[in-house]
Amino acid sequence: MFMASTTSAVPWHLSQPTPAGNGSEGELLTARDPLLAQAELALLSTVFVAVALSNGLVLGALVRRGRRGRWAPMHVFIGHLCLADLAVALFQVLPQLAWDATDRFRGPDALCRAVKYLQMVGMYASSYMILAMTLDRHRAICRPMLAHRHGGGTHWNRPVLLAWAFSLLFSLPQLFIFAQRDVDGSGVLDCWARFAEPWGLRAYVTWIALMVFVAPALGIAACQVLIFREIHASLGPGPVPRAGGPRRGCRPGSPAEGARVSAAVAKTVKMTLVIVIVYVLCWAPFFLVQLWAAWDPEAPREGPPFVLLMLLASLNSCTNPWIYASFSSSISSELRSLLCCTWRRAPPSPGPQEESCATASSFLAKDTPS
């Protein structure tokens, strides 16, 4: 079975091919709705510029920050998240933009397979880097001694490597599903997928939805809840800890510390809500229409709202850099400096613990032995 679409910026295709019959390639190209095609190009162009510009700015701020000292652990994750989102822009949105402009994939079979593989790598990496970042913050807050032993400052760490490794591994089926194939015997070649009838497409789309959206969303939400519980527990009554011992369950020792803890808790709640809500809002419409199209033969695959929603696979890549930058005072200051073109000397880079504020728990991170 061949499933194809020239209107979906996703690593698989759900719409039925443009009717070929015995017409020429030129006749096939004119079968598209010109207004819808223009809307697709405009939307993809906007998304590409937004993703590339947003992540480029944040990555530039990180590089500039790193020149004055080693990266904090959170900087490492944000940097790799920016790289993953830039991969989405370069390997998913940009090829699809060129594809939509010509209506057919223009390139050899090897390029077809490579583009489809890299499109999926970007989707996986963007989601898994957020999950890895959240898991690391959970370890830093709930297991500070373990986090301290691993240290920081390097541009790579185990969660980052695992996120990239799983992204590269889980994307491998794309190399075998897609190829340059003849469009319904018309003589026109396009980059098409072949799925087993009738369950292949449904199984694959459902698997992608689970692995890219559902599982990471549940993991992110669970980690944020555990982080919040850890912070909340630190406010409760408990024995005064021994010197150098854990501080779980102890009250703040001064009004100033209490105010700092309360602010951290409030920031944690905001961070949790922003991460989970934005993640779900960005991915849910896209995967809902994909699952609908895969499971319902009568789905309105060619309707404008349906088609345009299928183009929003990379929407989360537009929001990622701003969410995490807004909760990092160091990155925010660098961004303001870049955007305002004020290249004045910034304050010295804090240690690796500074970026625990990204989970609104700087007060706990400071309990980590140094």
From Swiss-Prot:
It is found in: Cell membrane. Residues 1-38, 99-113, 181-199, 293-307 are extracellular. The chain crosses the membrane at residues 39-63, 78-98, 114-135, 160-180, 200-219, 271-292, 308-327. Residues 1-21 have a biased composition (Polar residues). PROSITE patterns: G_PROTEIN_RECEP_F1_1, G_PROTEIN_RECEP_F1_2. Its main location: membrane. The record marks T102, R106 as: Implicated in agonist binding. GO terms for biological process: cellular response to hormone stimulus; G protein-coupled receptor signaling pathway; positive regulation of gene expression; positive regulation of vasoconstriction; regulation of systemic arterial blood pressure by vasopressin. A lipid is attached at C340, C341 (S-palmitoyl cysteine). One of its GO terms (molecular function) is vasopressin receptor activity. InterPro entries: GPCR_Rhodpsn, GPCR_Rhodpsn_7TM, Vasoprsn_rcpt, Vprsn_rcpt_V2. It is a multi-pass membrane protein. Keywords: Cell membrane, G-protein coupled receptor, Glycoprotein, Lipoprotein, Membrane, Palmitate, Receptor, Transducer, Transmembrane, Transmembrane helix. Residues 1-26, 347-370 are annotated as: Disordered. Belongs to the G-protein coupled receptor 1 family. Vasopressin/oxytocin receptor subfamily. Interacts with ARRDC4. Identified in a complex containing at least ARRDC4, V2R and HGS. Interacts with TMEM147. Receptor for arginine vasopressin. The activity of this receptor is mediated by G proteins which activate adenylate cyclase. Involved in renal water reabsorption. This is Vasopressin V2 receptor. The gene is AVPR2.
